[in-house]
């Protein structure tokens, strides 16, 4: 569960950390194993919302190898396409084939290690003696790969309708409504009994901050009969 937006009202709002600062902290904590250059933005979302790095795991205890060491950042973004996560696709298959060929042509220890790990992954995904189900293949891929996602949620102070309109992460309802997650966190979460012992009222104040009404004034919205806010998300009008 993510507590952001108005539900983060009890946190020190002056203690913000930017996406760049998070990436620098990761680089420092990993002692350079991961750098800013190993992260890419997610194409299906606004560029300020997500940064992701994929790592090839060494099951013998060696350091993980970021995908950007054998795939360009542009190729990795292209393989992500219109999804938040890497999924099997012809584009990803071709990219990995190209990466294997380039690694094979190199003559250094790290390239050889990356080749060895990729070979292990391929053997697990495509064993010679049997076919594997899609579920088995997914589990094998998850075992040999890790992803680090940095997600910059919005709250009332940095609420940006341009980012909201490009959102690809939404709460979905039976009537087909999709509410971008940051819009839900800011406008709805603290008014639902399942999340709040004492749900707040629209327009109520907390330490001088108006809940929801300031944000609603920023966006052009259409309301359905239940009063729930409908905001556009990427790919929908």
Feature-to-residue mapping (PLM):
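Radical SAM enzyme core and accessory elements
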Residues: 56-237
């Amino acid at each position: 569960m993510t507590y952001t937006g108005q539900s983060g009202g009890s946190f020190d709002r002056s203690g913000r950390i930017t996406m760049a600062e998070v990436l620098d902290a990761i680089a420092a904590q990993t002692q350079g194993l991961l750098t800013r250059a190993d992260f890419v933005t997610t194409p299906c979302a606004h560029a300020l919302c997500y940064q992701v790095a994929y790592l090839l795991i060494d099951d013998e205890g060696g350091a993980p190898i970021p995908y950007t060491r054998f795939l360009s950042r542009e190729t990795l973004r292209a393989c992500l396409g219109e999804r938040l996560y890497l999924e099997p696709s012809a584009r990803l298959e071709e990219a990995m084939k190209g990466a294997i060929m380039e690694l094979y042509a190199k003559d250094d220890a790290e390239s050889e290690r990356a080749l060895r790990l990729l070979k292990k992954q391929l053997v697990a995904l495509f064993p010679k003696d049997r076919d594997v189900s899609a579920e088995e293949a997914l589990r094998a891929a998850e075992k040999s790969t890790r992803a680090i996602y940095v997600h910059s949620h919005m709250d009332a102070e940095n609420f940006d309708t341009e980012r909201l309109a490009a959102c690809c992460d939404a709460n979905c309802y039976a009537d087909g409504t999709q509410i971008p997650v940051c819009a839900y966190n800011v406008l709805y979460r603290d008014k639902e009994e399942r999340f709040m012992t004492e749900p707040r009222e629209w327009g109520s104040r907390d330490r001088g901050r108006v809940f929801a009404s300031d944000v609603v004034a920023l966006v052009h919205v259409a309301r359905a009969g239940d009063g729930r806010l409908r905001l556009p998300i990427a790919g929908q009008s």
